[in-house]
């Protein structure tokens, strides 16, 4: 995942390539096929040659993005690498990059433990999490709440629109937020907010998912968010923007709602629809079914075994 930051350098990767063995590289973001960035945003220079990087304070024609792109390109020449993206969206971006042209590029989603992440009693979950029993609860989570890419501002705006358009319905709502700096947004929501701060214990996370009614992820650019799969596995319908790998995970009006990109209004529509017009029990059952059938550890393991057998010539 994060192969740099003192874990694996380009020199280390070179040594692995020089072993002559076939390599399977799982991509969790765009770094393997860009100069230096993990998410390129609106920039598409990685398709041909990174330079004048918009993420650098002073990008230039031969900045560090340019130089690293060149190093990677030389590194990958002649290598036998199968790049596995975690979403069809990331796979499509990777195939545009000149950096890994000629390499095998495919996609396999992340796996989750569906024996742990599964539906549990909502009343008991709320008691454990000290959450009210009489509210319809929305959940938003991120390691860093203030990361603009995660889109919490759109959720705040959507909640304000709900409060304005559906005043009676809005009285039933509350927002559960997990992640660092959650308290900073408490005063911005028109509904009660219940900060959970940073959650590192998976069992506690399972309780939080089971305690809520909807998981809302207004992310502006994301690969295949584990939080969506985890919530779905617990039978929680999800709402998210039509971006990245999100529409691959959420089947619109079937197990959740895929909102128009960067539209707080449609995000609000999705929240209201799921909790008032949609058949909630059916949404919940389909969310759980999708998670188990598509993202269980056994399902994903079989897909990787197929790749390993193919690149090693073992077709048994």
Predicted regions and their residues:
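A short, active-site helix/loop in glycosyltransferases that binds the activated sugar's phosphate group
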Residues: 34-39, 59-104, 112-116, 122
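Conserved donor-binding/catalytic core segment of Leloir-type glycosyltransferases
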Residues: 131-150, 156-160
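Nucleotide-activated donor-binding/catalytic signature segment of Leloir-type glycosyltransferases, i.e.
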Residues: 166-172, 177-206
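Short hydrophobic beta-strand element within catalytic cores of glycosyltransferases
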Residues: 237-240
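Conserved acidic donor-binding segment of nucleotide-sugar-dependent glycosyltransferases
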Residues: 252-253, 257-264, 273-278
